[in-house]
């Protein structure tokens, strides 16, 4: 929604979601796992690539209890080169009238994470996971998309990096991926969550314990989205609706892919899918972290 004017100077923000508990990682804080020869963490590479692509600011979403560690490991260093702000995601940061159900431990999901940025992010943005590496081209494509003019005031105008399936697969077992369905203009129709994707003995890509195969060049979503501040405003209304239905759940999450898919189905958003040749790297599990070194 809104009108972007050609030629106006536009600043852009990188939002990094780093508040997840990371229960599958097994040791330490996975977002701060050292990856490079000089003890770089995966965010170092993402922030460098984002700056090279033209992003001006970094907003890092974390838990309050790991603030000092984040600043020691990366924040105090990168603030010399980019504007950096921290936003805290808390399980009890809820709208008036709602409370945390007894026994719930995990945050409310990526939708709530981005919503936490409402008072901080006032520019076009790209949002990524802290523990994933997306590559240089993905940042460039989405940055250029954000600064292009558009005048559709009836729908949320968004972008998504489309990764080639074969560039996202793990050697450590099967994975779940969001298979993208697009039209002839590369506009997103929907994302189908597909489980159990991996190579069989013949080197073919299969899924969900079937003999059916997937094309290795199929585009998938790796949760790298581009949007504008009005989308964050919408998340506030959507979060109240989500809590009205799921507020007593121990594990229900307010997730960006589901939120955006609902907007697509209601014809309230348009999402441009930009194909990137970059290889995606993640450190969801500790063995995958070691294999990435």
Indicate where each model-derived feature is located.
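A C-terminal functional module that forms or caps the active site or interfaces directly
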Residues: 236-269
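A short, conserved beta-strand element in the Rossmann-like catalytic core
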Residues: 22, 133-135
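N-terminal glycine-rich phosphate-binding loop and ensuing alpha1 helix
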Residues: 7-75, 84, 89, 123
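Short beta-strand-to-loop acidic/aromatic patch adjacent to the donor-nucleotide binding site
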Residues: 123-133
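Catalytic beta-strand/loop signature of glycosyltransferases that borders the donor
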Residues: 219, 271-278
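Short, surface-exposed amphipathic charged segments that create phosphate/polyanion-binding patches used
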Residues: 96-107, 173-178, 287-291
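Short phosphate-binding loop-to-helix
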Residues: 78-123
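Conserved core of the sugar-phosphate nucleotidyltransferase
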Residues: 136-225, 229
